[in-house]
Amino acid sequence: MTGRLAVLVNLGKTWALLGGASALLGGVGWLLGGYRLFSIFVFCGLLAAMALYWYADRVVLGMVGARELVETEAAPLFTTASRIAARARMPRPRLYMIRDGHPRVLSAGRGGRGHALVVSTGLLGAAQPAELEGLIAHEVAHAARRDLLVQTIAGVIGATLLETSRAGGWFQRGLLFVLGPIASAIEHALLSPRREYAADLRAAALCDSPHGLADALLRLELANELVSFAGNPALEPLYTVNPFEERGLAALFLTHPPTVKRVARLRALDPDWEQRNEAA
């Protein structure tokens, strides 16, 4: 799929998602109170859809506890992000940090100036420059294709459904069994694993090498295997590598392909890599 076609497809998915959510609210209103409540619920749904389009990234940033960085705090990160964004002909993403000793990276927003890139303190302390460049390029590629727009809105809707059902009490726990699969179905219907392969391929081109991203993916995967991650699993699509354990409720929201397959595809872009690696 070409870049322009991918943008159009993702914009279509976004408006279908927002329209579907509004229609669902309208259906609830009709069941509860007929046409009068139907009109009110549809109107509220449209307002919520507009709010999601413009502010879903802020909701995500609040959920993960991110704060915006200034350039003096992480000058190399800003330099790398500016360089990669310029190569992709995109504005530099807004850069945020979460206090987490383990390497993690995620993005949220609409793309362009609405794109927020979040890194953990553990990633800044552990990643090599080429790895950091590869991860930034991967997320910029998502923003350029407007994958990020669909991922963010689907993630926020799913996360909100789960948070509502987790509020406590037997009724909310019952809702979890109903809303959990619904939120999962929404994400799987809109988010194909192919989007990750496409972003990986574009990132390799932006970096002139696939190996920085490949090494970074392995680093993130190893960290996930060593330490379990507590968070809202509906936000899984926003992370570069799935940080959640692949069991229980989190298993419903897996939209990333296996990391080992992603790394293998990246290494295959450099046919001589294995020979050079063995010689070294």
Residue ranges of predicted features:
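Hydrophobic or amphipathic, alpha-helical segments that drive membrane association/targeting
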Residues: 1-104, 160-173, 177-189, 197, ...
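Residue-level signature of catalytic and energy-coupling elements of molecular machines
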Residues: 34, 57, 81, 119, ...
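Short amphipathic alpha-helical coupling elements at transmembrane boundaries
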Residues: 79-86, 134-137, 141-142, 159, ...
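Active-site-proximal gating segments in proteases and membrane effectors
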Residues: 89-114, 184, 204-280
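Active-site scaffold of zinc-dependent metalloenzymes
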Residues: 105-129
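Short alpha-helix carrying the canonical HExxH Zn2+-binding catalytic motif
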Residues: 118, 128-145, 149-150
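Catalytic Zn2+-binding segment of zinc metalloproteases
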Residues: 140-159, 168, 211
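Soluble non-cytosolic domains of exported or imported proteins
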Residues: 190-193, 257
